Amino acid sequence: MPKGYRKTLVRQISQHAHSEIVGQLPEGNWISRAPTLERKAILLAKVQDEGGHGLYLYAAAETLGTSREQMIEALHSGKAKYSSIFNYPTLNWADVGVIGWLVDGAAIMNQVPLCRCSYGPYARAMIRICKEESFHQRQGYELMLALCRGTADQKAMAQEALDRWWWPVVMMF
């Protein structure tokens, strides 16, 4: 494998892995504040899935000869990055729905082509990740739908979250 290609793969896969791990944080803050036990279980499962996605991707990058410790050190030192969408605060419960529906939806659009990328370990990880992200996207949609069918305050909260997240999500493309 050409050295430049290997370096680019490590950079891309590690950034993707970092994004999956850091992506747990905004929604993870809401696990203890979920309005029902069912919503808590759904959110807990989603956050666990995102952690698993990060681990799949770190494992794919490790096949290229870099260690997980090196990748994490690069993140901590600022040499490596993660998706900036995860820097936006989650101010209310509706943000969890918008993240699932729109952020995960945008991620799916960007990630499905990676299922056919030229590096096998990454492509195989992406097949599983995209299937799980599709489930997360549906959960977010259903959460927003429930809010939009709720009280006037719930509808307003859903609209406010959608308005706040719209442009950051569009910037994912």
Regions inferred by a protein language model and the residue ranges of each:
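Internal, conserved structured core segments that host functional sites
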Residues: 84-139
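Conserved alpha-helical segments that form or flank metal/cofactor-binding pockets of metalloenzymes
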Residues: 46-74, 140-147
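Acidic/His metal-coordination segments adjacent to aromatic residues that form catalytic metal sites
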Residues: 1-14, 75-100, 117, 150-154, ...
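A contiguous pocket-lining binding segment that forms or flanks enzyme active sites
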Residues: 121-173
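His/Met- and acidic-residue-enriched segments that coordinate or traffic transition-metal cofactors
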Residues: 3, 41, 58, 109-111, ...
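Helix-loop segments that flank and shape redox-cofactor active sites
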Residues: 2-5, 23-45, 106-122
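Alpha-helical scaffold segments that form or flank carboxylate-/histidine-based iron centers
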Residues: 5-16, 34-53, 96, 121-133
